[in-house]
């Protein structure tokens, strides 16, 4: 995973994203192990690989937008859909946007997601759910029977 994240950070630099913090290599004082520098990119275009890939590391890609609809379009324009994050004081906006996001989970204002709610993604981020009633359904077998009146 460390090597994959390093490759993606390098790709972000090579594709022209502006490196704001972090970058390649390990954090000072954490040379042992597989630690990655927390990395922030600005001026990211949604066509860049760092915007289109689930990195699973401490890498943030900042993509500017003008309107709510544009933000939703950018967020949904990826083959993945594990989770999204919304930061707003407007609860109606949070509900409206969350409904339009194509991801298995949406975190609003850092509240986190309850441990007993279904966990899983959309698109290439996996199928099925873990936890909650939907997680239990993964262990059930459904049978259809026909032929009597």
Feature map (PLM): residue ranges:
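Structural signature of PLP-dependent enzymes
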Residues: 1-4
